């Protein structure tokens, strides 16, 4: 019998202590604001501090976070943000809608201006590192001489560097060529070739897709600022990275040119597959390029008039 009374007494003491701690915490934390996902706690020294909420109330009011994750309520979202140290906001009320997965092949592999400029920056950095100042009794190598050396090493004898020769030149430096935008290595290899083409286009004054030494020198001149080219379509101009669609194919603006996929449409796009042949797709891309050329000619004429 006495054991039963002892147990009841211990429970009563524990309850009293808990009540006292709660009153003490309420008093210490009365003027402390911790923000969403955090709550005030009392340290061993009796000082207030803000910690992530230990447990949220289980009421159901689902919300979708900006990270694409569904939470039971607002409290759980802010608690997760606190625990992970990340910024998560309420995107909308309710469960997150399932996002349609986009196949990697849904977008064409392209070299954006940022990719082109990054490759160019790395090449210039590599070449500048090979500059040797003149010594007391020896002659060094300046930037133009270093470029001349590489130009002659990779030129096949026609005094021009085509895209394959330019690519071989760039491949001499691991850091310069190591552009990895895509998870697939084959796509990254294709990207390097496309960015080399984009570099050639920068200074290819006679549009023969080959660079003379003077064009090569201009392309990699550290003081040269590559222009930001836009794509034209239906009297509108689009910035680098802009996209448009035709049936199930996607076209992307990259370095001033429209680049499109050439997928065979099926399912809901079956009609497109039946009506649009490969030849028609080619014509569509050519039409995009004509819009681009027309816009550039108009721009040049306007510049001359000014």
Swiss-Prot record:
Binding partners and assembly = Homodimer. Interacts with SCN10A. Interacts with DIP2A; DIP2A may act as a cell surface receptor for FSTL1. Interacts with BMP4. Interacts with CD14; this interaction promotes TL4-mediated signaling cascade.
Residue stretches making up the EF-hand domain: 142-176, 191-226
Main subcellular location of this protein, as a coarse class: secreted
Family matches, as InterPro entries: EF-hand-dom_pair, EF-hand_FSTL1, EF_hand_dom, Fol_N, Follistatin/Osteonectin_EGF, Kazal_dom, Kazal_dom_sf, Prot_Inhib_GrowthFact_Antg
Where on the tree of life does the source sit, at the highest rank? Eukaryota
Q: Which UniProt keywords apply?
A: Disulfide bond, Glycoprotein, Heparin-binding, Phosphoprotein, Repeat, Secreted, Signal
Query: Where is this chain's protein located in or outside the cell?
Result: Secreted
Disulfide linkages recorded for this protein, renumbered to the chain, are 29-40, 34-50, 52-82, 56-75, 64-96
Looking up CDD domains in the UniProt record yields: EFh_SPARC_FSTL1, KAZAL_FS
**Signal peptide range in chain numbering:** 1-18
Q: Mind listing the GO molecular function terms for this protein?
A: calcium ion binding; heparin binding
**Gene field:** FSTL1
Domain Kazal-like: start-end pairs: 46-98
Q: Which residues carry this modification: Phosphoserine?
A: 163
**GO CC terms of this entry:** extracellular space
Q: Which Gene3D superfamilies match?
A: 3.30.60.30, EF-hand
Query: In the UniProt record, does the keyword Signal occur?
Result: yes
| Physiological role | Secreted glycoprotein that is involved in various physiological processes, such as angiogenesis, regulation of the immune response, cell proliferation and differentiation. Plays a role in the development of the central nervous system, skeletal system, lungs, and ureter. Promotes endothelial cell survival, migration and differentiation into network structures in an AKT-dependent manner. Also promotes survival of cardiac myocytes. Initiates various signaling cascades by activating different receptors on the cell surface such as DIP2A, TLR4 or BMP receptors.
SUPFAM superfamilies to which the protein is assigned, alphabetical = EF-hand (SSF47473), FnI-like domain (SSF57603), Kazal-type serine protease inhibitors (SSF100895)
Q: Would you tell me the protein name for this molecule?
A: Follistatin-related protein 1
This chain is glycosylated at 142, 173, 178
Q: Which GO terms describe its biological process?
A: endothelial cell differentiation; endothelial cell migration; negative regulation of apoptotic process; regulation of BMP signaling pathway
Record domain VWFC: where: 231-285
Does this UniProt record's set of keywords contain ATP-binding? Answer: no
Identify the residues that the record assigns to the Follistatin-like domain, covering every copy.
Answer: 28-51
